[in-house]
C-alpha cells in the first residue's frame, strides 16, 4: 500500500514539472506567464520561444502522462489502474505545486496518458485534431473538438468493436474527466473564437474567418 501511495504522489509531482516555464527561464530568460496567453504549455511555448522549444515542451509534457501511466507496470503494481496514475499527472500539469498551482491546458499530458493505455485511440484523436487544425487553423479548437470526439469514441466504438473492443467503465470515466479538464481550460479560447479573434497557426484554411487581435 505504501508503494502505491508513493507512486500516486510521484505521478502528481511528475505531471507538475513545468517544463515550459523552466525552459523559458533557463534558456531564454523569459517567464511565459508574462507573454502571449500567459500559459506554460506547448502552444504558448511555440509562439514565444520558437519551434525547437515548443517541440521539446510538447515531448516532455506528453511523456509525463505516458510515464505516469506506465508506473504500475514498471513497479509491478496490481490492484490500481494505470489510468489513475495518469489522471494525477494531468492534475499535476494543470495545478502545478512548482508554479503556484498554475499550469498548462492538459492536452499534451492527456495525450500521453492515452498513449500509455490505448495508442490506437490516441491515433484516432490525432486524426481528428489534425483535420480540424487544417480546416480552422486553431490549436485551441482542435483540442476541444478532439476532446469531444474522445467522449463520442468511448460511447460508440465498443458497440462495433472498433478500436475499443469492449466497454471499460474506468477508461470511460478517465476520458470523461480529461475531456472536461481540457474543455474547461480552454474556456477563454472559446470566448475568443466566438468573438472571431482567436490566435491562429500560420497554415490551414481558417474557415471560421478568425482575425487575431
From Swiss-Prot:
Top EC class for this record: transferase
An example Gene Ontology CC term for this record: plasma membrane
Subcellular location, record wording: Cell membrane
GO molecular function, one term: acyl-phosphate glycerol-3-phosphate acyltransferase activity
InterPro entries for the chain: G3P_acylTferase_PlsY
Pfam (any one): G3P_acyltransf
Catalytic activity: an acyl phosphate + sn-glycerol 3-phosphate = a 1-acyl-sn-glycero-3-phosphate + phosphate
Membrane topology listed for this record: Multi-pass membrane protein
Entry annotated with the keyword Cytoplasm: no
E.C. numbers: 2.3.1.275
Residue intervals passing through the bilayer: 3-23, 48-68, 71-91, 119-139, 144-164, 165-185
Main location: membrane
Pathway: Lipid metabolism; phospholipid metabolism
UniProt keywords, alphabetically: Cell membrane, Lipid biosynthesis, Lipid metabolism, Membrane, Phospholipid biosynthesis, Phospholipid metabolism, Transferase, Transmembrane, Transmembrane helix
Example of a GO biological process term: phospholipid biosynthetic process
Function comment: Catalyzes the transfer of an acyl group from acyl-phosphate (acyl-PO(4)) to glycerol-3-phosphate (G3P) to form lysophosphatidic acid (LPA). This enzyme utilizes acyl-phosphate as fatty acyl donor, but not acyl-CoA or acyl-ACP.
Subunit structure comment from the entry: Probably interacts with PlsX.
Similarity annotation: Belongs to the PlsY family.
The protein, known as: Glycerol-3-phosphate acyltransferase
Organism field: Lactococcus lactis subsp. cremoris (strain SK11)
